Amino acid sequence: MFKFILKRIALMFPLMIVVSFMTFLLTYITNENPAVTILHAQGTPNVTPELIAETNEKYGFNDPLLIQYKNWLLEAMQFNFGTSYITGDPVAERIGPAFMNTLKLTIISSVMVMITSIILGVVSALKRGKFTDRAIRSVAFFLTALPSYWIASILIIYVSVKLNILPTSGLTGPESYILPVIVITIAYAGIYFRNVRRSMVEQLNEDYVLYLRASGVKSITLMLHVLRNALQVAVSIFCMSIPMIMGGLVVIEYIFAWPGLGQLSLKAILEHDFPVIQAYVLIVAVLFIVFNTLADIINALLNPRLREGAR
């Protein structure tokens, strides 16, 4: 098991190097000189060759590309992502509070997505082929097909504006989490619930279930065995939903005026503030890699066959 964990962790580093290099290259995705991009982003009215040369020297654009990448990576490893092109403030000071706001919303939403997916998936699998199963799948399919921004808008209109129960936007207290969490749960639970249901149905059709039933094992004991084996899907759901939700919160945060990474990154994209964009992309990408690795390790702990297959 220790070797398996080491292999999975070792695989993270090449991926992170590739991701970090691709993130670094975001500065060069435009056809113009990065210095010109910076000057335009700062609203400089007259971009002269002297200003371009000065900006190139200030930001180290005269260095070879690999040297620039090395310097940028060493700073990023210390959570120093440079300064904002627009405000001149350190990016870490802007990213830090926004990251914590997004992380809190993501964790709460991920827990709700996991709980909802497991409950609906288990009930649907146990009632497969019956009215309850068909009703759950139909409602889940319908809700999943609805755009998140539409659901959010409807909730704001009826719950916040007409009924005046919850705040429409911003982060003013614990009640501010309710509407965004509901929207995120609706958007993702319908997707993950199908995975839980499929895993439960597969386990219920396994030979060991038939054997335990024939042996007269109590239903509750039998169900515990099935749930334990199907738990791997729930673990994967929880681990993978965190970076997926965090990476997909741009629209939700914009609608609810949530002071998080999504809204900050959207503003940075519109302003061509590349250091902020780089920090956002790198953080989300690293979270994807870390939580995917964590899911593999936890699943291997739950299922020894996965460890054998990875040797």
UniProtKB/Swiss-Prot annotation:
Q: Can you give the residue ranges of the ABC transmembrane type-1 domain? A: 99-295
GO annotations of cellular component type = plasma membrane
Q: Name one GO biological process term.
A: nickel cation transport
Reply yes or no: does the keyword Transport apply: yes
Listed A to Z, the keywords are: Cell membrane, Cobalt, Cobalt transport, Ion transport, Membrane, Nickel, Nickel transport, Transmembrane, Transmembrane helix, Transport, Zinc, Zinc transport
Please state where this protein is localized: Cell membrane
Activity regulation, short description: Nickel/cobalt import is reduced in the presence of zinc.
The protein's induction, as recorded, is: Repressed by zinc.
Q: InterPro entries, per this entry?
A: BPD_transp_1_N, CntB, MetI-like, MetI-like_sf
Q: How does it sit in the membrane?
A: Multi-pass membrane protein
CDD domains in alphabetical order: TM_PBP2
- Quote the disruption phenotype from the UniProt entry: Deletion of the cntABCDF genes decreases nickel and cobalt intracellular levels and decreases virulence.
- Residue ranges spanning the membrane: these are 9-29, 105-125, 139-159, 173-193, 237-257, 274-294
Q: Does the keyword Transport apply?
A: yes
A GO molecular-function descriptor:
transmembrane transporter activity
Under the heading NCBIfam families, the entry gives: Opp1B
Q: What does this protein do?
A: Part of the ABC transporter complex CntABCDF (Opp1) involved in the uptake of metal in complex with the metallophore staphylopine (StP). Involved in the import of divalent metals ions such as nickel, cobalt and zinc. Probably responsible for the translocation of the substrate across the membrane. Plays a major role in nickel/cobalt import in zinc-depleted conditions. Contributes to virulence. Required for full urease activity in vitro.
Q: How does it assemble?
A: The complex is composed of two ATP-binding proteins (CntD and CntF), two transmembrane proteins (CntB and CntC) and a solute-binding protein (CntA).
The record's family statement is: Belongs to the binding-protein-dependent transport system permease family.
UniProt name for this protein:
Metal-staphylopine import system permease protein CntB
- Organism (species): Staphylococcus aureus (strain NCTC 8325 / PS 47)
